[in-house]
Design a protein with these regions (language model features):
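Beta-rich carbohydrate-recognition and catalytic domains
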Residues: 2-181, 186-234, 243-297, 312, ...
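Beta-rich accessory regions
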Residues: 3-5, 25-31, 246, 279-518
Length: 518
């Protein structure tokens, strides 16, 4: 295919970008002034007000970590997308930066959609993102019209940028509207870009482009097509090399699949983010060697984006509310990101994701409970009021007989709680929200391998924030992210055993300090 990659960027300014950014800042500030903090995160990244979704433009640049994110500054529901921005010198203490992008060009007049950041050969950063327009000019009933855009920062602090314009147009006869979320990297002496596409046949694909100068791009081929015909779009694609413990290189392809049907424990969310591990050689398509696996098994995880800081592959995900009711929308804000996770390729041949080491810097006021034993249907309160904590716990599976055992978090006087438990009957870790007083309910499970079950030991690392929980199983072999809307009053944490006994080898509770964005 040719004819849709211009020799130079194309742009048509229709609004003053500076004025639009000023309006957006005022929109966020209006929500922030009235925000209810009952579920607003203490140590997760969120906007000061308004709606957020996908993490964007993740990078480590000139000594600072930068996290951008999709932002609707004028509502707590999804709307015209902007780019919000926070930065940090240590991944522990964060500061708010000016909003980076607002719609101001004809090519993006209905939204500055998701994209990524990459450092070029000259050491300078470039942003690639999707410009979004409604095909009928006013709403989503006629589908999308999307193109890929380039922007360059005006300073090393990344507090403003100059939009260069469209670098890849959309061949509308080959695409069923969805055409977005560019990811750029370099292999050898050539730059590559991939993004998600819904083909004319409504198949979820990732297309591959190449460039010598990061401006003029050439279509190469379909990098990957999802084998499931129900999957019509692969959002927020990711693609990166990773080495195992022996130094052997594999390639990871990640995407958020739209259209997959639920089956058993798999694909229970509206859309599901996952990956495959395989091989790739420039000039060829990606060759998967594994099945599709979820990045995260919780209720509320989507649109992850990873980046390499020179030593580690780090990923942030968006905690997506997915389905109503969404009570935080009444509080002047909606949505937050997960903790940053380091991706490694384990000896078991699978990806592990665990919080980056810097997260230990959030701990304060630690209590070590040592070993704990509970009798049949036993219960022990380990915190009377835990607003923001991390719990490290190791369960002795061989010495426990409980059918389910674990932690009731956000346990309030009205009887509401969220349950993080090991379920012995199904051999899985569970986040169960059946007792939640607000928000969506249901439960999600993370699998344990036969090897893990046979080990007789289960390690859980549980991060509880004001309105969400993240669970890391056995040093990150599985991860789970779910919203948990606590009721009014003290929020206790209780260790419980159901229909049997529980033996905990160790339990440590850390109260967590703020990351500075409240």
């Amino acid at each position: 295919m040719t004819g849709f990659t211009p020799d130079a960027p194309v742009l048509h300014e229709i609004k003053n970008h500076g004025e639009e950014l000023t309006k957006a800042e005022a929109g966020v500030a209006a929500f922030a002034a009235k925000r209810n903090n009952r579920w607003y995160p203490k140590f997760h990244i969120a906007s000061n007000g308004g709606w957020i979704n996908d993490p964007n433009g993740l990078c480590f640049y000139k000594g600072r970590w930068h996290v951008f994110y999709q932002l609707h500054p004028y509502g707590t529901q999804w709307g015209p997308m902007h780019w919000g921005h926070v930065s940090s010198a240590d991944m522990v203490n964060w500061k708010r930066e000016p909003i980076m992008f607002a719609p101001s060009l004809e090519e993006e007049k209905d939204g500055v959609f998701s994209g990524s950041a990459v450092i070029g050969d000259d050491g300078k950063l470039k942003f690639y993102y999707t410009g979004h327009r409604w095909a009928n000019g006013h709403d989503n009933t006629g589908g999308d019209w999307q193109v890929q855009m380039l922007a360059e920062p005006n300073n090393d602090e990344l507090t403003s940028a100059t939009k260069r314009g469209m670098v890849i147009d959309c061949p509308t006869d080959k695409v069923n509207h969805h055409y977005r979320d560019p990811k750029v990297w370099k292999t050898g002496d050539k730059w590559y870009m991939t993004f998600g596409v819904s083909s004319a046949e409504k198949r979820g694909q990732m297309w591959l482009f190449s460039s010598d100068d990061m401006v003029k791009w050439t279509y190469e081929q379909v990098l990957f097509e999802h084998p499931d015909p129900d999957v019509f779009m692969l959002e927020c694609p990711d693609f990166f090399p990773i080495k195992d413990v022996e130094g052997n290189e594999k390639w990871v392809i990640g995407f958020s699949a739209m259209g997959a049907k639920a089956s058993g424990f798999m694909n229970r969310n509206v859309s599901n983010a996952g990956y495959m591990i395989g091989t790739w050689t420039p000039g060829e398509a990606f060759q998967p060697e594994t099945e599709f696996r979820l990045w995260d098994c919780g209720h509320n995880y989507y649109a992850p984006q990873s980046f390499n800081d020179g030593e580690r592959q780090i990923v942030y995900g968006w905690m997506s509310p997915f389905v109503e009711p969404i009570p935080m929308q009444d509080d002047g804000w909606c949505g937050n990101l997960t903790l940053p996770r380091e991706i490694t390729l384990g000896a078991d041949g699978d990806l592990h994701t665990a919080p980056v080491a810097e997260m230990d810097g959030l701990r304060e006021n630690t209590t070590d409970f040592g070993a704990i034993s509970l009798g049949v249907n036993g219960e022990q309160t380990i915190a009377d009021d835990a607003e923001a904590v991390e719990i490290e716990m190791t369960i002795d599976l061989n010495a426990s007989t409980a059918e389910r055992a674990g932690l009731k978090i956000h346990a309030t006087e009205d009887g509401a709680y969220t349950y993080v438990a090991f379920d012995d009957q199904i051999g899985r870790v569970v986040i169960d929200r059946q007792a939640a007083a607000q928000g969506d309910r249901g439960y999600r499970t993370a699998p344990l391998s036969a090897e893990e079950l046979a080990s007789g030991e289960l390690k859980l690392r549980v991060f509880v924030d004001r309105g969400c929980v993240e669970v890391y199983v056995n040093d990150g072999r599985q991860a789970m992210s779910s919203f948990s809307y606590a009721s009014e009053g003290p929020r206790a944490i209780k260790l419980v055993a159901e229909s049997g006994t529980l033996k905990v080898k160790s339990l440590v509770l850390h109260h967590m300090k703020s990351i500075g964005l409240e």
